[in-house]
């Protein structure tokens, strides 16, 4: 069941360039610096108690910064604090906030393209030791790419035939398990990231169609249960889905090579929250079922989803 709650603004600040995305993930629990990307391609970090000037800023992209993810600031898990951004210029850039003048990794769009695809979403994952971390990126032309930060190269890519609005690993601080990818025209995909088979297109995946066909703006996994995630729809609905693993997650083909086997996806519940798209959703890491979401109706809503531990 879904319940609505209310909240009040604590502080406000207006900036010259509109802000497109933001994240606390590269900040420590004590300082709580907010990293933001704007329409001018500037990446900046703000102290919420001193909003007059940024702590630091850098020109990260040649156009709008469409998406951002960050991790490592809370000193939990593995790896340095890092911020990854995806922009209209098609670039994916990774920055360490401690040395922010230049990216520690940058993945450029292929040369010779008539039109450079926008990068619409980025997500960290596979951060299971100090030496490993990957980035999952989705583009407006339907491409989804997995970048290996250790080797600085594309580890896997696939075209889903619809613009990729959101992508997320079920857990980013473990060896890759599975990921969810949401696209235009009401489709989302779940890929099993444990077994790679090049001849079969890389990782096995299952595709689901949203009943209304509305654009899916986000897919956010529950921190307390990686097999549950919320999907935000362009029709103003949110839907809670569950993934059921198969009896065996891998099989062997006639050549003796292993390939992944996908499970099943089912919708547990849904709720109409707005008449406008639900474009962002974030779960509380401390309180199971507590979440906040944003919508194109310029409203921010606090939501409580109950009985999740029984699913």
Which residues make up each language-model segment?
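Short, small-residue-enriched loops and turns at beta-alpha junctions
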Residues: 153
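WD40 beta-propeller repeat fold
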Residues: 1-147, 156-174, 178-191, 206-224, ...
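Active-site/pore-lining binding-face segments in mid-to-C-terminal subdomains
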Residues: 196
């Amino acid at each position: 069941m879904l319940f609505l709650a209310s909240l009040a603004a604590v502080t406000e600040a207006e900036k010259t360039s509109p802000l497109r995305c933001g994240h606390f993930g590269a900040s420590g629990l004590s300082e709580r610096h907010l990293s933001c990307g704007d329409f001018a391609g500037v990446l900046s970090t703000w102290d919420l108690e001193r909003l007059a000037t940024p702590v630091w800023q850098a020109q990260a992209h040649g156009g709008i910064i469409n998406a951002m993810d960050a991790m490592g600031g809370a000193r939990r898990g593995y790896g340095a604090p890092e911020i990854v951004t995806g922009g209209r210029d098609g670039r994916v850039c990774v920055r360490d906030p401690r040395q922010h003048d230049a990216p520690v990794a940058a993945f450029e769009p292929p040369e010779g393209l008539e039109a450079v695809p926008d990068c619409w979403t980025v997500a960290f994952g596979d951060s299971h030791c100090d030496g490993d971390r990957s980035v999952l990126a989705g583009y407006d032309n339907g491409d989804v790419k997995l970048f290996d930060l250790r080797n600085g190269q594309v580890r896997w890519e696939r075209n889903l035939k619809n613009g990729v609005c959101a992508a997320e690993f079920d857990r980013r601080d473990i060896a890759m398990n599975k990921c969810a990818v949401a696209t235009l025209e009401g489709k989302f995909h779940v890929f099993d990231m444990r077994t790679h088979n090049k001849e079969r297109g890389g990782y096995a995946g299952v595709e689901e169609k949203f009943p209304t066909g509305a654009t899916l703006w986000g897919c956010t996994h529950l921190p307390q249960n990686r097999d549950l995630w919320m999907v935000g729809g362009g029709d103003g609905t949110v839907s809670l889905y569950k993934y059921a693993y198969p009896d065996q997650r891998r099989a062997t083909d006639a050549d003796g090579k292993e390939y992944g086997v996908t499970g099943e996806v089912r919708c547990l519940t849904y709720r109409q929250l707005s008449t406008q798209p639900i474009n962002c959703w974030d779960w509380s890491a401390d309180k199971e079922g507590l979440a906040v979401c944003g919508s194109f109706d310029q409203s921010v809503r606090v939501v409580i989803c109950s009985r999740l531990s029984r699913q």
